[in-house]
Structure formats: C-alpha cells, structure tokens
Design a protein with these regions (language model features):
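Proline-aspartate-enriched helix->loop->beta-strand connector
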Residues: 106-108
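Mid-sequence, gly/pro-rich, charge-dense loop/helix-turn segments that line enzyme active sites
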Residues: 120-218, 222
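Bacterial N-terminal signal peptides that target proteins for export
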Residues: 1-10
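C-terminal motif of bacterial Sec signal peptides marking the signal peptidase cleavage site
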Residues: 18-21
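Bacterial signal peptide processing site
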Residues: 23-25
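N-terminal short beta-loop-beta anion/metal-coordinating cradle
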Residues: 33-99
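A C-terminal functional module that forms or caps the active site or interfaces directly
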Residues: 208-250, 259
Length: 291
C-alpha cells in the first residue's frame, strides 16, 4: 500500500511539473487572448440582411441587441471582439446606426461594407472596391432656371459640401471626400490574397439616396467625382465616423454594373461579408500585436 501511495505521489509531481512546463512554453502565446480581450470591438456594418446576417452567423458567443429599430450582434470572431451592425438602407439610417454604435460600443474602427452598382466600365461583378475615398454624390447646387426652363441633371455639376470648414459660407461649393483609414487599408491588402472571386482595387465610393440608371449621369459621376461604384450608405457613415474621430473604411463589392452589362448576382453580398471579416481579423491582429 505504501508503494502504491509512493508511486501515486511521484506521478502527481511529474504531472504538475509537466503542466507547469507546458504553461511556461506557451507563455508568449497565452498573452494573445488577453490582448484580444483588451481591444475595443470593431464594428462591421451591412445595410440589409443579405449584407449582414452571414457575418453575424459566424460570431462566437453572439448576443443580439436592439437600439430603437437598429440591430446589433455582439460577439467574437477568431477571438477578437466584433459588433455586426445592420444599419438598414439609406443615408439617414446608416448615419443613425453609426452614431449609436459609436456611443454604445466605443469601437476601435468601423468598416462599412456591402453591395454596390458599378460606375467604372473596367470593373466587373464580384470585384471589390476599397474606399480610398468615399463621397456624397447626392449633395449639389442646381443652376438657376426660370419656370418653363426645364431641368437637366447633367447640368448639376456644383457639389455642395454639407460639412464645410467654414460654416459661415452660405454656398460651400466643393466635393467633400472622406479618406479611408490607412491601417484599415493595410489590413485590406493583407486580406487581398485570400479573395479569389474578383479583383480588389482602391477607388472612390459614391453614396446617395438615389438609384442611378441613366448611363450619361453615371458617366458624369465617374468623370467629375471619380466614382468607382455607387450605393446608399458609406458616405454618411464616413461623415459620422470622421466627426467622432473613429477610423473608417468603406468596402464595396460590385453586385451589378450596367456600364458593361454586368448582371446582378445575389451571391456578391455573402462574398463581401467574408472578405470584410478577413479584413477585420487582419486589422485586430495588428492592433493586438502593437499592444
């Protein structure tokens, strides 16, 4: 019996030493989850279910939170804190969702992603545009015309800046472009090799509560504003993020492009979500390593 107790004691000591050694060997790696937990969450937005629910389904330990009519999923992805926001469609909805997310979750950064229509004939369905710039293409001053003078949208070529540096200026005529955050762009480039369904390019995302189907008008936006794609949320998100000084990047996938007969493909919504999650992971990984 004494021999049995002796051997049990020896085994217990060996086990303790072995586990201690394992913990010691993994010490450099054990700090990673701690650093991940210390990070503020990154918010990834999508306007519609087809642009948000795929991401939400991939979160671990997700909880759903409703603030007014805006839906948020809070959880982790690859160990990093992530909030998925369904902003709903349009400039006002996305601006409100962004302000709520910033106030409620204090995010480290915001990615606005989803589908878009092409303005650049060289881009095709499933190509992804990284918003080096994001701009509001729905703010402009029309020319003066008398009753009976008609209306021609191709003459609406004076952009109106709704966020002027000089608020005393009664007519701030300028194209306001919000620049994509450089660290988020770097993360997007790190994720680029994993995306194989199309190109990933930098460009300008144009936003407005308008669905443009006039090819001459689209060509004008592409020429004057330099737009690659159009959609209905990113510029308002960029504007709110800018005022709260939160890093921002717009990521848009071409779901259709009438400039080159690119037909709508509903699978683009999920493809962009997968890429956006990859970008978020790369960004959070870099932030954790920098701590």
């Amino acid at each position: 019996m004494m021999q049995v107790k002796y051997f049990i004691g020896i085994a217990s000591v060996c086990t303790a030493l072995f586990l201690g050694a394992c913990n010691g060997d993994g010490n450099s790696n054990s700090t990673q989850p701690q650093e991940q937990a210390k990070l503020q969450p990154i918010v990834i937005q999508g306007a519609l279910p087809v642009e948000s629910e795929k991401m939400a389904a991939q979160l671990d330990n997700a909880t759903v939170e409703m603030i007014g009519e805006w839906k948020f999923w809070k959880g982790t992805y690859k160990g990093y804190p992530v909030v998925i926001s369904k902003t709903r469609m349009g400039m006002s909805n996305s601006a409100a969702a962004t302000a709520l997310a910033i106030q409620h979750y204090k995010p480290i950064a915001i990615i606005n992603q989803g589908t878009a229509g092409g303005h650049d004939p060289d881009l095709h369905v499933f190509d992804i545009v990284l918003g080096k710039y994001t701009t509001n293409i729905g703010t402009f001053k029309t020319p003066n015309k008398p009753v009976g003078g008609g209306s021609n949208a191709l003459e609406w070529n004076e952009a109106f800046d709704v966020l002027p540096d000089d608020e005393s200026d009664p007519e701030p005529i300028a194209i306001r472009k919000f620049e994509g955050d450089k660290e988020l762009l770097l993360a997007a480039y790190k994720a680029k090799p994993n995306y194989t369904k199309g190109q990933v390019v930098e460009g300008t995302i144009g936003s407005a509560d308008t669905w443009n189907n006039e090819l001459d008008r689209i060509k004008q936006f592409h020429t004057v504003y330099g737009t690659s794609v159009e959609e209905m949320e990113a510029a308002s998100v960029a504007q709110i993020a800018h005022q709260f000084e939160v890093p921002f990047l717009g990521i848009r996938i071409l779901s259709n492009n009438i400039t080159n007969n690119g037909a709508y493909d509903p699978a683009t919504g999920e493809a962009c979500q997968e890429y956006a999650l990859d970008v978020a992971e790369q960004y959070m990984k870099a932030k954790a390593a920098a701590k």
